[in-house]
Structures are given as structure tokens and as C-alpha cells.
């Protein structure tokens, strides 16, 4: 009989379901639980191996006939923003991101709901309640925090805090070799700001200031318009069967 160490992770496989990225495809995921004293170390190892975190679950695609989902991470030390990305930074000079503990707030959920209703009305998260949101944010056994973006105020240069309602929010994991953007959302009425791009650019700079070599962006899916934007942040590394390979 095969025995397993008491704290060894157990992996499970989901049933097939429609792929949210490629029409006509079906997805399956392999997943394990991130709980207990080894959760942080396990999250490190699995993220570096192409997994993503959702609450206390780490998962990666395990589709039978498709390998389109590719883990990507930005090489922070070599990144230089493009002309269009510099324009995004300029448009958002009036914003400041403040790291804070992963505690949910009603103003965050209100923004989250507006974002889902405007951008992902047919997605799997559209029915999330305030309790679901709270669990997404605070149900974690790893090192994580929120970065909440607000407009700059008269005292921002002194205290680093913005004013007014949040305009964008990112749930961010801290790893030994980088930051991982777990989930982000933003004010849909501020589309001209390109807030999704701005948060990635801001997190690249945060990783740089922390001396971390990578920013993990999750999966890039060739042929999916939803994921095209991730290819614009280079140089980056993509996880291939032989390991991480540099692109750009």
C-alpha cells in the first residue's frame, strides 16, 4: 500500500467544462489545497510551476486536447515601457496605490460589482455575493495583500494615501522571486485610463523596488482576445515543457 507524508499535498482533477477563452474547447483543471503550515512554501513551488491561486486552492489547466494556456511572468529588471504604456502611466499620474491588509470593504465590493456587471456580465463570477467577495480576499494561508488605488490628495506626498472612493484594486501575492497578481478590477466608467494596463505597470515597479525579478501575470492564451494584453509586457518568460523560456 502506498503511504503519503501527513502534510503532502493531494491533487485532484475537475470534470470537463466549457472553456472560457476558446470557443468549442473544454477545460479541466488539476488542483490542490493551500492550507496548513506548508501553504506558503507550496504556493511558491506551484506558482513557479505554472499554478495559480484562488483562495485556498492552487490550480492549473490539465486539458486533454489543448495546451493553449501558457504561464507568463515579466522579467522586471529588463522591462522598459513602450510609448503607449508610457502614455498610460502619464494618464494615471493622479492615482496612488496603497498596499493594505487583505481585508474586504463595502466600497471594494461596490466597485467589484460595477466591474463585473460592465465587463464580465456573462462570466462565472457574476453571481458573487458580498460574502463570496470577502472569502476571495481574506481566505488565504499565504502572504498576500491588497493594493487599492485612489486619487492623490493634498497629503499624499507625505502619507502615501489617496482620497475618495477606490478606482482600482488588485489582490497580490508576495513570493520569494516576485509578485503575483491574483485578481484585479477597476472602475468601468474610467475606461480611458486603461487601468488594467496601469496596474500591471505599477506592479512591475513595485517588484523592482522590492528587488524581485518577476511579476507573475497568470495565463496567456494565444488566440484569445481576453488574454492578448499579457503579451505586451516584455521581455517575459513563458513556461514551456522544458521550463521557463524567455520571449522578447
Swiss-Prot record:
GO MF annotations in UniProt: arginyl-tRNA--protein transferase activity; leucyl-tRNA--protein transferase activity
Q: Where is this chain primarily localised?
A: cytoplasm
Question: What enzyme class is recorded for this protein?
Answer: transferase
EC number(s) per entry? 2.3.2.29
Tell me which GO cellular component terms the UniProt record holds. cytoplasm
Q: Which residues form a coiled coil?
A: none
Question: Cross-referenced PANTHER family, in alphabetical order?
Answer: ARGININE-TRNA-PROTEIN TRANSFERASE 1 (PTHR21367), ARGINYL-TRNA--PROTEIN TRANSFERASE 1 (PTHR21367:SF1)
This chain's protein is named Aspartate/glutamate leucyltransferase
Gene symbol here is bpt
Amino acid at each position: 500500500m502506498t503511504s503519503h507524508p501527513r502534510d503532502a499535498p493531494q491533487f485532484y482533477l475537475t470534470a470537463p467544462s466549457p472553456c472560457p477563452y476558446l470557443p468549442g474547447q473544454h477545460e479541466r483543471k488539476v488542483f490542490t489545497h493551500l492550507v496548513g503550515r506548508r501553504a506558503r512554501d507550496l504556493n511558491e513551488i506551484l506558482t513557479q510551476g505554472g499554478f495559480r491561486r484562488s483562495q485556498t486552492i492552487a490550480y492549473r489547466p490539465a486539458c486533454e486536447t489543448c495546451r493553449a494556456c501558457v504561464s507568463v511572468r515579466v522579467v522586471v529588471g529588463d522591462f522598459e515601457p513602450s510609448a503607449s504604456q508610457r502614455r498610460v502611466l502619464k494618464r494615471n499620474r493622479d492615482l496612488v496605490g496603497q498596499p493594505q491588509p487583505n481585508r474586504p470593504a463595502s466600497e471594494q465590493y461596490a466597485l467589484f460589482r460595477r466591474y463585473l456587471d460592465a465587463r464580465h456580465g456573462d462570466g462565472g463570477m457574476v453571481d458573487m455575493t458580498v460574502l463570496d467577495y470577502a472569502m476571495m480576499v481574506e481566505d488565504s494561508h499565504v502572504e498576500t495583500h491588497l493594493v487599492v488605488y485612489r486619487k492623490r490628495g493634498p497629503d499624499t506626498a507625505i502619507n502615501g494615501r489617496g482620497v475618495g472612493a477606490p478606482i482600482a484594486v488588485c489582490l497580490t501575492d508576495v513570493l520569494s522571486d516576485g509578485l503575483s497578481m491574483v485578481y484585479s478590477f477597476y472602475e468601468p466608467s474610467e475606461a480611458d485610463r486603461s487601468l488594467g494596463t496601469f496596474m500591471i505597470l505599477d506592479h512591475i515597479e513595485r517588484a523592482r523596488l522590492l528587488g524581485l525579478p518577476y511579476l507573475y501575470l497568470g495565463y496567456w492564451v494565444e488566440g484569445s482576445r481576453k488574454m492578448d494584453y499579457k503579451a505586451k509586457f516584455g521581455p517575459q518568460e513563458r513556461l514551456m515543457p522544458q521550463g521557463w523560456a524567455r520571449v522578447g
